[in-house]
């Protein structure tokens, strides 16, 4: 093969040049939705999600997204409308947060039970009382047992890319479950940064033939019962209910490998990659580590770099996929770690610790060895998790290596800010 022919062949396989823009996280999410070519969106605005659905509406109005849009009277109706669209075979999308997510709680559970591959962006917002419209993970964490896949984004670019991938993950025949793309309210929703837009033709090739709801799409020639009344003590109700739940669990576990496959395909076609389940940062020779979720990871990586320069053998573990929880990937990441500090942006009231810390304790148990650990809670109601905050986490976690006793209570990072 001549040099010219070889160069042409390499160029044909290389990702095409991408348009570069400055975009906020909410706009990046909307652009990712447009690239995935949904058939139907239904929306209701709520801070800090509002500008996202405004961007979606404008893309449709400008002819840049060919989708039907339904302006419903509230979030309960938003998701109910999309269930009907999905049952008819449409690719569907919405976004919400906080009280809006609470309002759609009933159809939210029904969506996963009916195995409808709807993509819903949660622009994460802290809980109410005392009132807050600022960022926090409490809303998303509150619904983590509702059968939805949940992935968390660190950057605006990751928001766009993950949004596109979410549709392919949800619609995979081994998964068929709805997906939450979670981005931090305020920090990512309104934070602007450089974003590369992949070519639409490349994304179309990546998405492939649409295969939405082949299992439940309504068809007069194939009648079926949708969401039947089950349970009780007579007939086959209990068995039917168990089959539904078992199928959801199977789809959730299948999602782990599918998420990895989809991320690998995206990296190959687009030329940009993100850790699909768990990101290991400077962990190869680390003696201890900190764990992060979402946008706090940027500041945490800077703090880890500074600590490394000071001679500390510290690494970082970022959880990208929270549901299903990546047990095996996390076991591998924790393989050589001797102490761990986990930073949550929400509260697990039952166990008096962060929800991610609670999940991690289960993984530590499965490791079969004791790793001293500390639960840190910070960034509530829009508070900053700064580099100095992370240095505190690093120093206190390192102290566990030298015999310090881990506190039995969570450490509240912003208590005295």
From Swiss-Prot:
InterPro entries: PadG (IPR054807), PFOR_II (IPR033412), Pyruvate:ferred/Flavod_OxRd (IPR050722), Pyrv_Fd/Flavodoxin_OxRdtase_N (IPR002880), THDP-binding (IPR029061), Transketo_C/PFOR_II (IPR009014). It comes from the Bacteria. GO terms for biological process: L-phenylalanine metabolic process; response to oxidative stress. Induction: Induced anaerobically by phenylalanine, phenylacetate or phenylglyoxylate. GO terms for molecular function: NAD binding; phenylglyoxylate dehydrogenase (acylating) activity. It catalyses: phenylglyoxylate + NAD(+) + CoA = benzoyl-CoA + CO2 + NADH. Its EC number is 1.2.1.58. Keywords: NAD, Oxidoreductase. Activated by magnesium ions and thiamine diphosphate. Optimum pH is 8 when measured with benzyl viologen. Half-maximal activities are obtained at pH 9 and pH 6.8. It is an enzyme of class 1 (oxidoreductase). Pfam families: PFOR_II, POR_N. PANTHER family: PYRUVATE-FLAVODOXIN OXIDOREDUCTASE-RELATED. Dimer of heteropentamers composed of an alpha (PadG), a beta (PadI), a gamma (PadE), a delta (PadF) and an epsilon (PadH) subunit. Involved in the anaerobic metabolism of phenylalanine and phenylacetate. Catalyzes the oxidative decarboxylation of phenylglyoxylate to benzoyl-CoA and CO(2). It can also react slowly with 2-oxo-3-methylbutanoate and use different electron acceptors such as benzyl viologen, methyl viologen, FAD or FMN, but NAD seems to be the physiological electron acceptor. Also catalyzes an isotope exchange between CO(2) and the carboxyl group which proves partial or complete reversibility of the oxidative decarboxylation reaction. This is NADH-dependent phenylglyoxylate dehydrogenase subunit alpha. It comes from Aromatoleum evansii (Azoarcus evansii). The gene is padG.
